[in-house]
Design a protein with these regions (language model features):
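C-terminal segment of classical bacterial N-terminal signal peptides
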Residues: 2-10
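A short, Gly/Thr-enriched small/hydrophobic beta-strand-prone motif that recurs across taxa
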Residues: 14-34, 582-602, 615, 721-730
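Short, acidic Ser/Thr/Gly-rich low-complexity loop/linker segments typical of extracellular
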Residues: 32-34, 53-71, 597-605, 622-642
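Hydrophobic beta-strand segments
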Residues: 45-50, 614-618
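A short, solvent-exposed loop/turn motif at the edges and junctions
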Residues: 54-55, 74-112, 644-708, 727
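Sequence/structural signature of beta-propeller domains
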Residues: 65, 71-585, 635, 681-683
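Extracellular Ser/Thr-rich, low-complexity/disordered mucin-like segments
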Residues: 760-810
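C-terminal membrane-anchoring or membrane-association module
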Residues: 805-833
C-alpha cells in the first residue's frame, strides 16, 4: 500500500517544491534514536504542513507510516512547519516518543523543512506506548507445579531473559520467590511494575493441591524476595470440587475440574489500577482494584459472552492479555457436548470496558505435529474435543501413553507490529500426570501423559485484522529442515517447538510472552534442552519462527530436572510474566531566532532560524543544576529519556535556564553578538507547541532567561514544548527637538516622522489543543504538545500591525521570493535518516 498524499481535497506543496515525506514509526526503546530493525510503521497519525502565509495541507499516515506531500499549488515558499499529532483512538495508548540530538534521531512532533527549488526533504518522528518498556536486564517469572509427592518445593521462580542452557549444570539456576507450601499450585501471573510485585493465581490440576487459601486465591509476592507471599484477593465462586487430600496420587474425583474451575488467566491494566482474572467456573471476567495491598471484593464481574459454540456449555474462556490499553480475552469452543472435532475453535475478544468485540475466530481442525511418534495417528496429530469420561478413559491412550491433546487458549502475547501469539495448553495434561494413578475405582495402575500444546501466530494485517499462520500474508515457516520431522502438510509460524526429529513435534506447554525490545517469543516447553522429562523455556525467533528444537543450546533454558518434577513430559509450568519497567520521562525542544518578534515558531526562513550552541541548564526545585547541554544545529535540546545521564523525577518541579549568550548567531540576520539577543513574546497564540516559554528578564544578563517546568507525571511521557525564542531589540529613536515657531507669517511645515513606529506584533490566533508551551509533542487531547490545527498560521495573517505595514511586509516577502535558496534550513535529517 503506497504512502498517502497530504490533502486538503487533493492539495500538496508548491509546484516548484521537491517532495516532502513525513514518516511516523512506533518506537520501543525510548532512546530518541531510530532502530531500523525493530521500529515499525505507525498508521493513523495526523500530519499538518503549514507555509509562511498560514496555508495548510493535512494528511494521515498509511500502513507504511508515511504521508507524501508532492509539489502542487496549495503551499508556497518552499519552507514549511510540519506538525504531527496523535488522534483518537490512538491517543488512548500512544504518546510522542522521546527525541534526541544524536545521529539518526527521531524528530520532534513540530519540525521545520525546506523543499524549495526542487529539493526533497523528510521528517521521521516516533510514537510509543510506554507500557511496552522493559530494561535490558529484565527477568521472567514462571510458576512451577509439582505433584504432592514431588521433590521440587519452588512455586515461583525468576531468571534473566538471557539465560540459556541447563540448570544445574552449564547455567545458573533461577531465584525462588515463593514455595509450594506458601501458595500451592498456581498458573496465572501478572507483574505489577508500580509496586514491584507479582500476582499469582490458584490453579486446578489433578494430583497437586491448592495453596493454604484455596482454589479461589490470588497471592502477591514482592519481586525482590524480601518477604513471603500474602493473600491479595479471592475470586468468588470459583471452585466446587475438592481434591482428595487423603490420596493425592490418585485424586479420583478431580478428573473433570481442570479447565472448568479455579482461576484462568490474569492481566493488569497498563496504569496498574485494575487486576483482571477469569473465573473458569462461572466463565466471568472479574476485576479488582489493584492499587492496595489487598482487595476485599471484586469491583466488577462481567459475563464473557459465548461466541456461538455448538453448546453454550462448551465455551471455555481462559487467557488474558492487556495490549495498547485494551484487554484481550482468549478461549475455545471445546466441542465437549458434540465430541466432533469440527466444533473446535479458538476465539479472541477485545474488551474496552463496555463491550466484547471478536477479533479472531479460528477453527482448530488442522493437522498438527505428532505429540509422540507416528504422523499417521489422528489422535496424536490433532486437537481433540474435551473429554474426561471414565467410560472412555482408555481411548485417551496412544499405545501405552496417554495422548489426547485438548485445547485451552491459556495465554496471549503481541509482537511489535500488533500480531498475536497464542499459547495453547493441553488441558488433558492437567487431568493425567506422569506416574499418577488411574482415577477409576479398583484400578491403581500408574499412568504417564505426554503434553501436546502449541504456539501459534495470527499476523496483523494493515487494516487491523488477523490472518492465521500459513494463510494470506502470514508465513508458514515449517520445512523438512525446520519442522522436526512433522508431516509436510503441517503449517506453522513457529515450527521450532519440537524434541528430536520425529519424537515430539509439539513440546509447547501453553504459556507465551514477548518483550518488544527483544527478538524472541518465550514459551514454556518440556524437554527444552533435550534432557528427558524436564521443563523450562524455549526461545522462538519472532521473524523466522525457529526455536528450541532447531538449536537447543542457544534457544532453551531448562530449570526443572527429571528428579525435581513429578509431572515429567506432562509439563509442570504455569504462565510467563516479564519484569516491565516504568519508562523514563523527557522534556525539552527548541531555541530559535524569532525575527518578526511575534512569539510564534513560523516556518524557517531568513528571519526564522534555529539557534545552535545555546547553553541549556536544568535546575531542580532548590535551584541546583542537575543537568546541562547545548542546542544542536536544529536549535534542539533534551533532558531525560532512556540512557540520559540525569533521570527526571515524574511530577517534579524544575527550571530550564536558557543561556543564549553562548549561542552561535552566524545564521542570524546581521550576525549580532549573542549577548545582544533578547527573549521574544512569551506564550503567544493558542498553541503551546509553537510558542516561547521564557518571560523576558528585566535585570541582569538579558540573554539569560528561565522557564519553570513541571515534569510529566506518568511513565514514558514527554514534554517537548519547553522552547525559547529570541530577537534583536531595536531601540526607539530619540524624540526630535520641536522646531521653533517661525516668526514669519508662513504656515509651519509638517515633516514626516524620522522613522516608522516599532513593529511589535501581537499574539496570533489559532493553535491546537496541547498544553505546556513550545514546539511540541503529544496527542490531540493530551498535555505536552500536539500542534492540532491552526497554531500561528502564518506571520503575515495575524501580525497586529497596520494595514500599511502589512502591505510593506508582503511586498518585501514577494521581492525576496527569488532568494529562497539563501534561507537557512535544517539539513541534518537528509544525511542521518
Amino acid at each position: 500500500m503506497g504512502a498517502t498524499a497530504a490533502t486538503v481535497g487533493t492539495a500538496a506543496a508548491s509546484t516548484g517544491d521537491g517532495t516532502l515525506t513525513v514518516e511516523v514509526l512506533r518506537d520501543f526503546f525510548g532512546t530518541g534514536l531510530i532502530n531500523t530493525t525493530m521500529d515499525v510503521p505507525q498508521r493513523g497519525m495526523k500530519v499538518q504542513v503549514t507555509d509562511p502565509a498560514g496555508h495548510k495541507v493535512t494528511g494521515t499516515t498509511d500502513a507504511t507510516g508515511k504521508v507524501l506531500v508532492p509539489p502542487s499549488t496549495e503551499l508556497t515558499g518552499g519552507q514549511y512547519r510540519v506538525d504531527v499529532t496523535i488522534p483518537a483512538p490512538y491517543n488512548k495508548h500512544l504518546r510522542a516518543a522521546p527525541a534526541a540530538t544524536g545521529k539518526n534521531h527521531f524528530d520532534s512532533f513540530t519540525t521545520f523543512v525546506d523543499v524549495s527549488d526542487g529539493k526533497d526533504d523528510s521528517v521521521i518522528t516516533g510514537v510509543w506506548n510506554p507500557a511496552d518498556y522493559a530494561l535490558p536486564d529484565s527477568r521472567y517469572f514462571v510458576p512451577i507445579q509439582n505433584t504432592a509427592d514431588g521433590k521440587d518445593t519452588r512455586a515461583l521462580v525468576a531468571f534473566g531473559t538471557d539465560k540459556r542452557g541447563t540448570c544445574p549444570g552449564d547455567a545458573a539456576c533461577p531465584t525462588a520467590l515463593n514455595t509450594q507450601d506458601q501458595v500451592g499450585t498456581t498458573f496465572a501471573l501478572a507483574y505489577d511494575k508500580y509496586q514491584k510485585r507479582v500476582f499469582q493465581g490458584a490453579f486446578a490440576r489433578r494430583y497437586t493441591p491448592y495453596g493454604p487459601e484455596g482454589g479461589d486465591a490470588i497471592y502477591t509476592t514482592p519481586t525482590d524476595g524480601g518477604s513471603a507471599p500474602t493473600l491479595f484477593a479471592k475470586v468468588p465462586g470459583a471452585t466446587v470440587t475438592p481434591h482428595d487430600a487423603t490420596n493425592m496420587i490418585k485424586d479420583a474425583g478431580f478428573t473433570n475440574a481442570p479447565g472448568k474451575e479455579s482461576i484462568g488467566g490474569m492481566a493488569l491494566s497498563e496504569d496498574g489500577s485494575t487486576l483482571y482474572a477469569v473465573n473458569l467456573l462461572t466463565r466471568r471476567l472479574v476485576s479488582f482494584d489493584a492499587t492496595g495491598a489487598t482487595a476485599s471484593a471484586p469491583k466488577a464481574t462481567v459475563r464473557i459472552p459465548d461466541p456461538g459454540c455448538a453448546n453454550p456449555g462448551d465455551w471455555r474462556p481462559f487467557g488474558l492479555q492487556v495490549h495498547d490499553n485494551k484487554l484481550y480475552v482468549g478461549g475455545v469452543c471445546s466441542a465437549e457436548s458434540t465430541q466432533q472435532r469440527e466444533d473446535l475453535k479458538a476465539v479472541v475478544y477485545a474488551y474496552d470496558g463496555e463491550r466484547f468485540d471478536t477479533v479472531l475466530t479460528q477453527p482448530l481442525t488442522a493437522k498438527r505435529g505428532s505429540v509422540f511418534g507416528s504422523n499417521d495417528v489422528e489422535q496424536a496429530t490433532h486437537w481433540n474435543p474435551w473429554n474426561t469420561s471414565l467410560a472412555t478413559w482408555d481411548e485417551r491412550k496412544v499405545g501405552n501413553v496417554f495422548i489426547d491433546p485438548q485445547p485451552e487458549l491459556a495465554s496471549l502475547a503481541f509482537t511489535r507490529d500488533g500480531s498475536m501469539v497464542l499459547g495453547f495448553r493441553d488441558r488433558f495434561m492437567d487431568v493425567v500426570s506422569w506416574g499418577g494413578l488411574d482415577p477409576r475405582p479398583d484400578n491403581d495402575a500408574p499412568e504417564n501423559g505426554m503434553a501436546g500444546g502449541d504456539i501459534n501466530m495470527a499476523c496483523a494485517t494493515p487494516t487491523g485484522e488477523y490472518e492465521w499462520e500459513g494463510t494470506g500474508n502470514c508465513p508458514n515457516h515449517a520445512t523438512p529442515a525446520t519442522g522436526g520431522g512433522q508431516d509436510a502438510s503441517v503449517a506453522e509460524y513457529f515450527p521450532g517447538d519440537f524434541f528430536g526429529n520425529g519424537v515430539h513435534a509439539e513440546t509447547a506447554l501453553g504459556s507465551v510472552a514477548y518483550i518488544p525490545q527483544q527478538q524472541w517469543v518465550v514459551s514454556t516447553e518440556f524437554d527444552p534442552t533435550v534432557n528427558v522429562a524436564t521443563s523450562g523455556t524455549g526461545y522462538h525467533n519472532v521473524t523466522t519462527g525457529q526455536g528450541p528444537g532447531n538449536a537447543p543450546a542457544a534457544n532453551a533454558y531448562q530449570f526443572v530436572s527429571r528428579e525435581q518434577s513429578g509431572f515429567g513430559k506432562a509439563g509442570g509450568l504455569g504462565d510467563i510474566a516479564y519484569e516491565a519497567a516504568n519508562a523514563p520521562i523527557q522534556i525539552g525542544n527548541r531555541v530559535w531566532f524569532d525575527g518578526d518578534h511575534n512569539g510564534i515558531q513560523d516556518p524557517e526562513g531568513r528571519n526564522e532560524v534555529p539557534l545552535p550552541d545555546a547553553t541549556i541548564n536544568l535546575l531542580d526545585a532548590d535551584g541546583k543544576q542537575v543537568a546541562t547541554t547545548t542546542t544542536d544545529a536544529a536549535g534542539e535540546y533534551y533532558f531525560g529519556g532512556v540512557g540520559a545521564a540525569y533521570e527526571l523525577k515524574p511530577g517534579a518541579k524544575y527550571t530550564v535556564q536558557f543561556d543564549v549568550c553562548t549561542a552561535d548567531t552566524s545564521e542570524v540576520p546581521t550576525q549580532p553578538a549573542a549577548t545582544k539577543l533578547r527573549f521574544t513574546l512569551p506564550r503567544a497564540g493558542d498553541n503551546r507547541a509553537h510558542d516561547s516559554n521564557v518571560t523576558p528578564p528585566k535585570t541582569g544578563r538579558l540573554c539569560d532567561g528561565q522557564a519553570p517546568v513541571t515534569a510529566p507525571d506518568k511513565p514514558g511521557e514527554v514534554d517537548h514544548t519547553i522552547d525559547a525564542g529570541v530577537y534583536i531589540h531595536k531601540a526607539k529613536p530619540p524624540t526630535p527637538t520641536p522646531t521653533p515657531t517661525p516668526s514669519s507669517s508662513e504656515p509651519p511645515s509638517h515633516e514626516p516622522p524620522a522613522s516608522e513606529p516599532p513593529n511589535h506584533p501581537g499574539p496570533q490566533s489559532g493553535g491546537g489543543s496541547g498544553t505546556g508551551g513550545g514546539s511540541g509533542t503529544g496527542g490531540e487531547s493530551g498535555t505536552g504538545g500536539g500542534s492540532g490545527s491552526g497554531g500561528g498560521g502564518g506571520s503575515l495573517a495575524n501580525t497586529g500591525t497596520s494595514g500599511l505595514l502589512k502591505i510593506i511586509s508582503l511586498s518585501a516577502l514577494l521581492a525576496g521570493a527569488g532568494a529562497a535558496a539563501a534561507f537557512v534550513t535544517r539539513k541534518r535529517r537528509a544525511g542521518q535518516h
